[in-house]
Amino acid sequence: MGTGFARGARGTAASGPGGGFLFAWILVSFTCHLASTQGAPEDVDVLQRLGLSWTKAGGGRSPTPPGVIPFPSGFIFTQRAKLQAPTANVLPTTLGRELALVLSLCSHRVNHAFLFAIRSRKHKLQLGLQFLPGRTIIHLGPRQSVAFDLDVHDGRWHHLALELRGRTVTMVTACGQHRVPVPLPSRRDSMLDPQGSFLLGKVNPRAVQFEGALCQFSIHPVAQVAHNYCAHLRERCRQVDTYSPQVGTLFPWDSGPAFALHPEPALLGLGNLTRTPATLGARPVSRALAVTLAPAMPTKPLRTVHPDVSEHSSSQTPLSPAKQSARKTPSPSSSASLANSTRVYRPAAAQPRQITTTSPTKRSPTKPSVSPLSVTPMKSPHATQKTGVPSFTKPVPPTQKPAPFTSYLAPSKASSPTVRPVQKTFMTPRPPVPSPQPLRPTTGLSKKFTNPTVAKSKSKTTSWASKPVLARSSVPKTLQQTVLSQSPVSYLGSQTLAPALPPLGVGNPRTMPPTRDSALTPAGSKKFTGRETSKKTRQKSSPRKPEPLSPGKSARDASPRDLTTKPSRPSTPALVLAPAYLLSSSPQPTSSSFPFFHLLGPTPFPMLMGPPGSKGDCGLPGPPGLPGLPGSPGARGPRGPPGPYGNPGPPGPPGAKGQKGDPGLSPGQAHDGAKGNMGLPGLSGNPGPLGRKGHKGHPGAAGHPGEQGQPGPEGSPGAKGYPGRQGFPGPVGDPGPKGSRGYIGLPGLFGLPGSDGERGLPGVPGKRGEMGRPGFPGDFGERGPPGLDGNPGEIGLPGPPGVLGLIGDTGALGPVGYPGPKGMKGLMGGVGEPGLKGDKGEQGVPGVSGDPGFQGDKGSHGLPGLPGGRGKPGPLGKAGDKGSLGFPGPPGPEGFPGDIGPPGDNGPEGMKGKPGARGLPGPPGQLGPEGDEGPMGPPGVPGLEGQPGRKGFPGRPGLDGSKGEPGDPGRPGPVGEQGLMGFIGLVGEPGIVGEKGDRGVMGPPGAPGPKGSMGHPGTPGGIGNPGEPGPWGPPGSRGLPGMRGAKGHRGPRGPDGPAGEQGSKGLKGRVGPRGRPGQPGQQGAAGERGHSGAKGFLGIPGPSGPPGAKGLPGEPGSQGPQGPVGPPGEMGPKGPPGAVGEPGLPGDSGMKGDLGPLGPPGEQGLIGQRGEPGLEGDHGPVGPDGLKGDRGDPGPDGEHGEKGQEGLKGEDGSPGPPGITGVPGREGKPGKQGEKGQRGAKGAKGHQGYLGEMGIPGEPGPPGTPGPKGSRGTLGPTGAPGRMGAQGEPGLAGYNGHKGITGPLGPPGPKGEKGDQGEDGKTEGPPGPPGDRGPVGDRGDRGEPGDPGYPGQEGVQGLRGEPGQQGQPGHPGPRGRPGPKGSKGEEGPKGKPGKAGPSGRRGTQGLQGLPGPRGVVGRQGPEGTAGSDGIPGRDGRPGYQGDQGNDGDPGPVGPAGRRGNPGVAGLPGAQGPPGFKGESGLPGQLGPPGKRGTEGGTGLPGNQGEPGSKGQPGDSGEMGFPGVAGLFGPKGPPGDIGFKGIQGPRGPPGLMGKEGIIGPPGMLGPSGLPGPKGDRGSRGDLGLQGPRGPPGPRGRPGPPGPPWHPIQFQQDDLGAAFQTWMDAQGAVRSEGYSYPDQLALDQGGEIFKTLHYLSNLIQSIKTPLGTKENPARVCRDLMDCEQRMADGTYWVDPNLGCSSDTIEVSCNFTQGGQTCLKPITASKAEFAVSRVQMNFLHLLSSEGTQHITIHCLNMTVWQEGPGRSSARQAVRFRAWNGQVFEAGGQFRPEVSMDGCKVHDGRWHQTLFTFRTQDPQQLPIVSVDNLPPVSSGKQYRLEVGPACFL
């Protein structure tokens, strides 16, 4: 670039002053034309396409969109920004698949926002860039993305490029030095939907907005641009991170008329480096501003040849390289800042021509870049430079030496010219206005001026000695169309205008070859040194000797005088193309004789250029030019001393939550301090820039309140602070902006199950209806065409939570486990082997929001949500006028203590505030030291009624006194001191029904009870699960031939056969003759056990055969396989007493026994330790008045004092030592049970007591009365099967069942026996319709009533349930008789009770006495009679404490005193009688299964209870003994065809073949298992065949039937039915039945009707609908049958039994057909699924998943890690099969989030995920080892559904 200008200068010398400039401007115009016509039209400036042009950013007329704040380096996007446009308006349709994205941005807020997103017309993401904390993700499609480890949320500017080429995405940083390529797994979609939408700053209109500054966002169709993207960065973008931006530069400002009229240095850019460049780039249209052309400075003085002013050549002596680096420091007179920078204007619309400038800058790690419209993509070896926004530059390390200028045009280090349009404005020269003081060196140049660039040296050589610091410039467009006349600029032109001209001979600036001009570096030229200037030049240039700095001398070594106070040395003053008001309107300046610019109109041939001419001679130096404008701002100087503290900035956004602080040390209970006065509101500080951290300065005085500053970047998490006090609630804030769409939440809590309805009364059995007329089977209807697509529905509410993601890839091979026990033979596995559990993957990229799901069912109310996070601060509003001082606002919430600031001045003392509200009671303080004993005060007023104290210690025996008269009742005395622990009292009377208490914990298993009497036979149990096959037994002896078996069960539904082709209709064959009976065959050898055959169709029951002859006793057969576990057998006979078992676990307290005889006095016990005082209980109810006691001895009269004021309650003194335990007194009569007190605090753990010896078993007590009905207990664990009991008595007849709905017509029954002779008809009846009845006979017997239930066996004794909740208080029982009087000792006379005396002072603490010797056991006295109650006596005066007297008669219950102080914990009392029935409590948590108790005896038969509701299916019992063969039952109807079951044991015989010859009687088979109770039998068998009656009268002909249509049946499905019908027809004919033709036709129609029904049934079995009537086995069956099923609720029946036990599940088809079971309630791990159904579901599944979330408050529920013994404190999860998931165990859950370890007074949650390949582990049935709950520590359980696949 400099080369071109040098040639222009030579042209000036050769052809005159004007010809050179004409030639130069022709080059400029031609270059601009090439740049405009041969540029890169496909480069896309996204900001400009979105309407954010630079003219707008610089203060143009068009307003910026809301939420976008322009500033000199680009645009700031706030939360309110919404930029969206059609994709076709932003990106050209010709954009290929190879792209390069060049970005320059700075993030202000950490979030997950997208910088941009391109979505298709269907709202699918096609391309997007997302910034996560620590990562940068580029999305190439809905499910294709690439992540890079680049964090842009660090508050710094980032320049980067992304290359999208083929199957590779490359991120390029550091100007191409750092590249990270990432291959794509699949080919990305290259076509972008032009009808889609382009969003800037977010991924969708509801998403979170990118908040930050964006300088450049360009898209290039050439992917290689990314590797040299710095060459395509705009100048202002390369400078943004070089300077510290100030707040003032971030907002547009107007360069008003003051700037135009007063060209002061401060206004021209020298005083404020941040405002001037913004002005220069802000309004090129209205101001016609040009940009300073700073001088190029060679590093040595060059000799110049000038006829007039050669002696002044030393004034142009440039600086040495060291001084050039020194010019980077700020100086008032330095102009190097703009000399090293170039103003870059935003391209205006439709600018046809451009000016090319270059910018050589200093070397730094970040390489510079140029505008996207660059002409020559060359690298620059220099650092990023300031372009006009910032005020300071980054210091360049002094070790980076500048390269020689000869490398400037080298291919690898050449600078890149920037093409930018300027305003097409004509400028007229005007005389310059003299500039004030800092620019005096510039004014001197108007007289003496030489050209230092092209000079003749004595050696006839011209050279650039070192790397010059060229200036970048921007020339107004006016200069493109003008020819510069001869002016002083022509002598500067070779230096200052060199950057504006391209090299000669360059056709396309984009492909400019690296040329080297001889004017710059001629071959063999001598390099000038820094001392080759003439002495004459030096002497006349300045009185001072030049002091160039050495190359090794840095800017910091240069003195300030060298940098700031040498007017003749810094550089050649910059002659500027000034604004229009500085240029003259005539060719000659009006204030001097020097020519200036002569601006002509457009040249006639601007685009014509001849071949490059030969190199011209150096021209003569021109006259000195006009004084230049003020120089450009100087470079940044050395770091100054640290300034004073700035005013505090505005409060920043809330930082990340700090860790929990250490608990504070509490020296004791702190008294509440007085409420301080409300302080005056503080002044707001000036918004300070985000500067580098300076040295700690002295505290400055408080500044004036400043305007609200820009929100600073989000700070890093602060140091761990102390928790602040709870502040007053602040005023209600304005509603914040609408937040981004949140992630799909967890499923809500499941609702509680509804209460069971009342059992209805059994209905009256209905009358049997008349036989309906059978209809003819209809044709199969063809499947209807699919319906039209419905109109799209409205957007529904947010659907249920999304399903889990796809199953991940197979994980790495895990460690080889220990060999497990040999398992039973498993079922046929599913497709494919499940892979091993993979390692936990990294957190995936947040997926794109899915389509709206189906509307889910309304969930129950969930737990209260956690408080939401604080919203983002809104955009900064315009600063308003300073308002008047407002009233003090309410105090805001107190924040965390900040850093200790400098002490401020003491403010004026404020007014005393009003007393604050009484604070919450503080924590109890530590007990202070005991104070000195104060003087005795005056006797106080009698205190309030005290609470009755505990029983005192017995006193010494007193003398016998005379019995006094009854005294007056005295007032209640003061509250006595807390007594010591009393003795165990007798069992009290039943109290009144208490309030509903909390559910108690599960008690220990009780001791085995006495064997009860035999109970009534129970209801028949359910069908048990098949047991594991047992070992083969020895061959048994051959049994006798068995009797005919009972009716079999309904067979399971067989598999569907393949559909056969429709056969042709065959001719009806004649009935063949009956064959002769064959010879009986020989008995074959017993074959081997065959494999299990496929399950065949259920055959229609054949006719009953005649009973066979009694067979011979058979040989013992081989032991067969162990059959399935049968129902529990009946109770066996009582066995002999077993051996004495081991001592059992301690049982619950037994019932109250009878009063035993008085035992001998026990030994004196040791004094127990005093327990911790319990919490203060509530006041009990006032009891009835007690008996008046005997008058006590009169106490000493106290002095009557005046009534004193009520004193304050003194502090509790320390408890005194317990005194010597006295003789146990007689127990008083227990009072009524008080109200339930509040729950006390958890007491300290007591010492482990010694295991007592087992007592003698007591006599069984009398049978108690039936207790009240207890609350429903939780489902206990399955007990072990009981022994086979003896056969019970026949059960009672059951209720008559309700009449069921009319079932479908069953298949034809078996052939009935011939009926009795019918009676002759008397009258001829009307012709009946064709019926479906059997052979004509008498009416059969009335059907038998329902079979009585099988006698059930006595169930296994269940575990003791958890204690029920405390019942309501019962009514007081009748007063008991006085107990027998105990042995009476020496009774002292009782004194009269005296009046209450004054409370004495508390005595000093006495020494603890030694335990007394053991007393002599006294004789037992005779039992006295109970005395009658005495009359109440009067209260006497208080007497002295008497010695221990004998126990008096039990008095009546006295009035309940006031609530006393909590006493020490007493010993546990005896168990009281059972209370009344309490309210049903909430179901408690499932307790651990207790140990199995010993077998109890048979209890007495109880009264027949009410029929209970249907219970859960019981566990399978052991196989019972074969029962006695029952009577022949009625034949039942054939059952429905069931689904294909799992492969079972050897199947039953197949379909019944044709009737064969009766063979010999076979061996007696093994007795089958007793079957379950069958359905009510159909019509009974016909009776014995009666005598044949005469034929009846012929009936009338029936109505004509419908036309015959051949029915199309599937051969395989209906073959068995046809065969059966044919067999039946053959049997009818063979036995000689003569049916009329009409009857045969009716039978055929009935059979076809049955077949039609069976066909429909088979079709429904093939395609289940998932309804309650037609359930599927699992959800996967529904997905296999119907490929397009919606997720939702369906019904399944895993065991394919009766439809009454179907399960309602949630099917997740998007996850492969998961079957999800919901818990009964989300707060408990309970599932309303029977164990039988669950076992089948486990067999049908191969894996399971379940989530459990624990919401906790200040509670840790999971701790796991090496070396932590605290893992024992973590929660444990019990699986369905009994295994335990726990920390550190064999099975551990996945903890994806553990927020409960944070204890900050807020709710957190810990999420546990259970994924297992063993489905029998799920669902989780209990959560154990949860920490105890207190007022400050709570938890909530949220159990998710268990999903099986």
Swiss-Prot record:
Sequence ranges assigned to domain Collagen-like in this UniProt record: 610-664, 673-732, 742-801, 817-876, 877-936, 937-996, 997-1038, 1039-1096, 1117-1176, 1177-1236, 1240-1299, 1325-1384, 1424-1483, 1484-1543, 1544-1603
Biased composition (Basic and acidic residues): 554-564, 1187-1212, 1226-1238, 1311-1323, 1335-1345
GO annotation, biological process: extracellular matrix organization; growth plate cartilage chondrocyte development
GO cellular component: collagen-containing extracellular matrix; extracellular region; fibrillar collagen trimer
Protein name: Collagen alpha-1(XXVII) chain
Entry comment describing in which tissues the protein is expressed: Highly expressed in cartilage, eye and ear.
Region annotation (Triple-helical) ranges: 610-1603
Pro residues compositional bias, start-end: 429-439, 639-654, 1588-1605
Keywords: Calcium, Collagen, Disulfide bond, Extracellular matrix, Glycoprotein, Metal-binding, Repeat, Secreted, Signal
GO molecular function: extracellular matrix structural constituent; metal ion binding
PROSITE patterns with a match to the protein in the record: NC1_FIB
Function noted in UniProt: Plays a role during the calcification of cartilage and the transition of cartilage to bone.
Family: Belongs to the fibrillar collagen family.
